[in-house]
Amino acid sequence: LIPLGAFAIVWSMEPSIFTKIINGELPCHKIYEDDKTIAFLDIYPIQPGHILVVPKQQIDHLDDLDDDTYAHLFRVVKMLAKRVKLVLGVQRACLTVQGFDVPHAHIQIIPCNQAADFYRIPDRSGKPNDQALGEMARRLATKEVVL
């Protein structure tokens, strides 16, 4: 038997899928990138334009980020949320922080016109639609927003 604490240490050392994206080991439909963060489309979006905003430093819990990275992450989220509303013409850019699927802190931006849009369960049974994701990424990546 492996003590739970030892398992947690070994498990946390594995690069997350987001770290693999950041390192260029896996592809993504990138919306934004700077020295501290990257933002890309969720391949199984709750709604079209569903963005994941991820710190480049792999930390499991958002509240464990250093203050500068935490603040920067939310500045990027604010900018991208405005961009989502402007480009997609939706009423809201809903935010969620869950962290159950990937052990790497991140914030999700989900375009919504009504509350039910936020709660839609995406179909993960098929292959992601790379053509639609690529077009959406181009639309969202090229619009500048002044904060």
What do the PLM-derived regions correspond to, one by one?
Residues 1-8:
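Intrinsic disorder/low-complexity segments
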Residues 8-147:
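HIT superfamily nucleotide-processing domains
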